[in-house]
């Protein structure tokens, strides 16, 4: 008597893959968010997250940059974005904000990272898990962390502290996706 046919095997494989993907996605945000929706900078993001891109904020006067913003996405977030056109629930984005130093080089005026100012962390939340927390809304968790304290946010309300910078990107789920070439591949 045949116990397992090709149909049962295929169903088993699909269930295993779906379970693995669900666990992987839910674990992406777990280390970053506690039960009350309080966030912190993920400790291992430089080792485990994928680089998305860098933005240069130009100097107020003259040439060069005043800041560099270097952005990373949690494991699996880029692959999911490439497949479905948006970040999946639980995806974590970390933006490092560096003061920039500028100097003349043989290639022209250049700006390079100098001192870390802090981190901006966003966690995708399409399910509205933390409705009573003022750092959650519009499908994301939002928090700024000063350099030196990756565990304590200085943000108090995403609407007043974070959202205004993202209004031009509202049509792309509040993320400036045009600056991340890896999302287009």
Give short role names for the model-derived ranges.
Residues 28-36, 41-54, 58, 65, ...:
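Sequence context surrounding c-type heme c attachment/ligation sites in exported
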Residues 19-21, 99:
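N-terminal low-complexity, intrinsically disordered patches enriched in charged
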Residues 68-78:
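Short, structured beta-strand/loop micro-motifs enriched in basic residues and often containing a Trp
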Residues 24-26:
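Boundary at the C-terminal end of the N-terminal hydrophobic targeting segment
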Residues 10-19:
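Bacterial N-terminal signal peptides
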Residues 1-7:
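Positively charged n-region of N-terminal signal peptides that target proteins for export
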